[in-house]
Swiss-Prot record:
HAMAP family reported in the protein's UniProt record: Ribosomal_uS7_B
Keyword tRNA processing appears in the UniProt entry: no
Function according to Swiss-Prot or TrEMBL: One of the primary rRNA binding proteins, it binds directly to 16S rRNA where it nucleates assembly of the head domain of the 30S subunit. Is located at the subunit interface close to the decoding center, probably blocks exit of the E-site tRNA.
InterPro entries on file: Ribosomal_uS7, Ribosomal_uS7_bac/org-type, Ribosomal_uS7_CS, Ribosomal_uS7_dom, Ribosomal_uS7_dom_sf
Pfam families (alphabetical): Ribosomal_S7 (PF00177)
Signal sequence, start to end: none
Protein name listed in UniProt: Small ribosomal subunit protein uS7
Any single GO CC term annotated in Swiss-Prot or TrEMBL for this entry: small ribosomal subunit
Amino acid sequence: MRRRRAEIRKVPPDPIYNDVLVSKLINRVMWDGKKSIAQKIVYKAMEILAEKTKKAPLEALHQAIENVRPIVEVRPRRVGGATYQVPIEVQEPRKTSLALRWIVEAARAKKGRPMAEKLGEELVNAFNNTGTAIKKKEDVHRMAEANRAFAHFRW
C-alpha cells in the first residue's frame, strides 16, 4: 500500500490549440511513446470534426467529449458473500478520462481506414450524440439504473 495518496500530474497543454483536453486525447491515442504520430492523427481528426460540424475545432471537441461523459457507473461491492453492482456518481476527472477512452476505443474498433479518419468520424458521431462511444455511455447508465436498488450499499 502507498504511504500517501499519489499526486495527480498536470498535463501540459498541446502546442497548437493550447488546450489540456487535446493533450489528453493525444496521450490516449499515443502508442509506444510515439507522440508526434499521435499528434498528427489527433490534429487531422480535429480538422475533420471542424469540417463536418461547421464549428471551431476546439468548441466541437469539447462538446463531443461533454456528450460522452458518464454521470453514474456501477462498482462491484461484496456484501455477505454476494457481490452487488452498486451505482455511484463518477468523479469529474474520471468522467473526462472515461469519455476519452471510449472515443478512442470506438475509433480503434473500426477497421479499414486511417486512424485519423476513424477518430474524426467518432468525434463527429459523439458531437451528434450517436455512435459507439455514446452507446457505451448509455449502456453504463442503463446498468446503473437497473441496479438502483443497491444504491444504499454506497460507501
